[in-house]
Amino acid sequence: MPVLAIVGDGGFQYGIAELATARQHALDVTLVVIDDGGYGILREYQGEAGFAHTGVDLVHLDFAALFDAYEIPVRRSERGRLRDELAWALEQRGPSAVVLEDVLRMPVPSALADL
């Protein structure tokens, strides 16, 4: 059964080693990595609460090059092209990926805004 995983770049870095498993076993998984340069949700929480952004910005990693290193088909995308790039990725056999370079916002304020 095909799997679609949508993950931020910060969280994705906790499980990079699993790319080897996906590649070795030709797992039918498509990854969409939202590359916003750090722990975006934590950055949002800190900003909403009026705190300075601390410990949430990461060194930029070329995620497309990482997927290439594992010989996993990958496309870079941006918001206006995501639908087409995702359709391409879902057509691939075995693992595939789309790297979306964008900053997404939380749809609703967190409870931290009330602090």
Which functions belong to the PLM regions below?
Residues 1-115:
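Thiamine diphosphate
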